[in-house]
Amino acid sequence: MILNASGCLDALEAPDVARALDAFVTKTVTPLPREGNRPVRIAETEAGMLNSIGLENPGIESLLAEKLPRLAELGVPLWVSVGGFAASEYAELCAVLDDRPEVTAIELN
């Protein structure tokens, strides 16, 4: 199975790439919007790259209202990546997404 890493592909900006995958994984979403970390977010090292974006995202309500319907139109299985700071936040997100027929799987970040 070939899929993207969460946050590495905007399927709405590159739909042909997303459609070529076996499944598309969304950028991680949290219960509330997050601005993420201040720059510098990415550093190159001899061993590779390090990143610490800080889970910047618009929150679950925005994902459900704005992005999820458009992502479902791509016709590729949709995995939603969720993040939280407590087990209850993960449970809340999973419960909301479990009721959505367009969501094929949930990734815990």
Give the predicted meaning of each segment.
Residues 73, 87-109:
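Alpha/beta enzyme core
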Residues 1-77, 83-85:
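N-terminal capping/small domains of soluble enzymes
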